[in-house]
Amino acid sequence: MLTKSAENKRNRKDDSMRPGQQLTLSIDHQTDFGYFLTDGEDTILLHNSEMTEDIEDRDEVEVFIYVDQQERLAATMKIPIISADEYGWVEVVDKVEDMGVFVDVGLSKDALVATEHLPPYEDVWPQKGDKLYCMLKVTNRGRMFAKPAPEDIISELFTDASEDLMNKELTGTVYRLIASGSFVITDDGIRCFIHPSERKEEPRLGSRVTGRVIQVKEDGSVNLSLLPRKQDAMSVDAECILTYMRMRNGAMPYSDKSQPDDIRERFNMSKAAFKRALGHLMKNGKVYQENGWTYEKK
């Protein structure tokens, strides 16, 4: 059983200022480098650099408690844009190999999104300028971590897509990557899915992508494609073929009779796409075929 003095000491410890708290404190006294604030028991420094407005005529001030660069408990009037109870979009400011990415939460110190909350492959980790939907966790030692929202949390932002979005372009932020595809949320809350077959490469977590709606689903979400429309792709593929031919003095040992594997290895396109592009070039009088070769018309 605790003695009265031991119980008071425990209660005092429970009530003491800790990193991660948002408190309203009284102004104790001013110094050249800031103000000392108090909760009636302990004092803490609010440095001039951490003030967002003049508090000379005030008795109390709302602050966030954190551990500064010198590992000291300190106060700031800059309130973080996310908290343990509130998720929000935060911007990536740095990426550290084998450690994670740091995000700006509105304080002079950034919060870490650890590797356990990031994809297994670093090439699809967020880069500077990308955004993640996170909450804030502050340890007793003052380390700040940002944790991306799980599906059940981010689903609170979802809105239903309308049928008239079919074939329209949507832009959004990649918020989840799994083996079966990429999930995106638009600024107005439409949930989008990109199957691996509808992209040339996997987008980064937190990056902005623009895709074409290829299906509006019954649950209000949509499927997106990041691939160009066939007519646009044909133009790109045709230019690729012409560029290759011009590197070989206007001739290449490929035609619409070439093997699919040979075409894919050389041009990174399917035989169907190759034939469409080649047909487009022949129709427009750019090339002709002869004995299994294709030649550029001069």
From Swiss-Prot:
CDD domains: S1_like (cd00164). Residues 1-17 have a biased composition (Basic and acidic residues). InterPro entries: CvfB_fam, CvfB_S1_2nd, CvfB_S1_3rd, CvfB_S1_st, CvfB_WH, NA-bd_OB-fold, S1_domain, WH-like_DNA-bd_sf. It comes from the Bacteria. Residues 1-22 are annotated as: Disordered. Residues 167-227 form the S1 motif domain. One of its GO terms (molecular function) is nucleic acid binding. This is Uncharacterized protein YitL. It comes from Bacillus subtilis (strain 168). The lineage of its organism: Bacteria, Bacillati, Bacillota, Bacilli, Bacillales. The gene is yitL.
